């Protein structure tokens, strides 16, 4: 089955589900203490599929540490994480600094199988380095180890390396 824009297959897929009712419930936690942050989210989609009540849960937990001393800003009134502001912006000239460097790790798990829904289970472990050049630009380097278990298929594993450049304005 084709996946994203480049045609790579999805690890998990339920196909189109004809459900009569569904609800999504989730909770998110964030803790920040100086350069260290912990974040987690859990969600479950509950649905009525072919007369059966089904639950499709997912969860992630991640930790990050800014090697250069920055912190992850949090706006309590809005309940949002704001952009990271490096102590020194990255620059090629003598006035430029090294930007902000963060090491991070993440665990995620998704279960798309319940009763007659056979979408499979996926577990990911991620290690990454985030390099914030300035408040609007960052590079993300990730290594991801994924383990998929889909009914009727042998368990599969894959290792991925990713690089993403992000500009936020």
Give short role names for the model-derived ranges.
Residues 1-169:
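Outer-membrane beta-barrel pore domains
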